């Protein structure tokens, strides 16, 4: 029993980040998701994620935090139980071009909402966009905020600097992050564009590559690929052109998907 009221039902997912279970509130019968993470100095992403969910409150398109705590040698986070991720949909090739555009707009809207709250996600990938349950089955939610970070402190944008290691999933990080430049809002957007490309085409050319430099080169050159839609090329050209501390023109990016 977790927090004296949550009964574990079944494991949903497991990875280097920890484990996620479906659970039931034995008092209200509400179904929830519980994330577990080994408690150590090296693993503090779950506490960071809980803090950010609490900060975001009832922000549209983000799960609600129920509680955060510790039991034994693990931290746990209780949150809304949501549905399948984009990975499941992409795997079964169930997305028409029109559906991709509808979902693409939601993806940009979610990251805009996060940015409007002075936060970067820094780990954008298909598995971090999930559909809602019940009345929200067509609505995307943005999850896994363990790597999220503030980019603005009291109206002052963080400074551009070099980083020691790549932050995020290698298949989806931006060209700037490949160059070991601190991520900013532009880089979240570039990662979102790669997610949209994955919805359109499935595995991208660089997904089977292991050489970091080759992956970066393939990403850079994708705008020269005749198969890539014009709106994607325009989005990439735009987001790769703006400065580190620039506010992306979200309306322009969305407009490219509704022309």
Describe the role of every protein-language-model region.
Residues 9-16, 20:
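Protein kinase glycine-rich loop
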Residues 19, 25-47:
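ATP-binding glycine-rich loop module of kinase domains
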Residues 51-60:
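Structural motif at the C-terminus of the N-lobe alphaC helix and the adjacent alphaC-beta4 loop
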Residues 64-75:
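Short beta-strand micro-motifs within the conserved protein kinase catalytic domain, predominantly
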Residues 82-91:
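Structural motif in protein kinase domains
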Residues 103-104:
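Activation segment signature within eukaryotic-like protein kinase domains
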Residues 115-132:
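Catalytic-loop of the protein kinase fold
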Residues 132-167:
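Activation segment/activation loop of eukaryotic-type protein kinase catalytic domains
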